[in-house]
């Protein structure tokens, strides 16, 4: 992944131009895959059922409250084959609909800062990769379950990197 990202960045006609970096397809796919595996939040805001609804074979009545689980959607194997594997290529081979990829929630209550957050992620990742070599330390090179921090998710322990 790192090698392919560096090759894409090296081929960028204007490597210092943030708008050009923002349009790099593989960089976008890597950021999307990170957000799929590590969404900003696990759950969406509660939604109130306004009229009778059948969803996944279950009936819901007006007044019922539904809460979508972003992580459960992102781990559905029929949408994302081998969902626990980091595979940015999946975002180059398929476009996902608004109900299939929702790292910042969905609908009218989707995070207002989503586009800015993704833009910043791309610029930061490109800048770090072009200037440094990053490696996980042995203590950090093991599965890292998420930890709820208020409404958002974060790592359950520090992520230590060796920077050269």
Model-derived segments and spans:
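Cytochrome P450 heme-binding "Cys pocket" and the immediately downstream C-terminal segment
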Residues: 1, 116-151
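Conserved cytochrome P450 K-helix E-x-x-R motif and the immediately C-terminal K′/meander segment
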Residues: 14-56, 77
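Conserved cytochrome P450 K-helix/beta-meander segment immediately N-terminal to the heme-binding cysteine loop
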Residues: 50, 68-95
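Residue-level recognition of short, solvent-exposed, well-ordered loop/turn junctions
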Residues: 55, 61-62
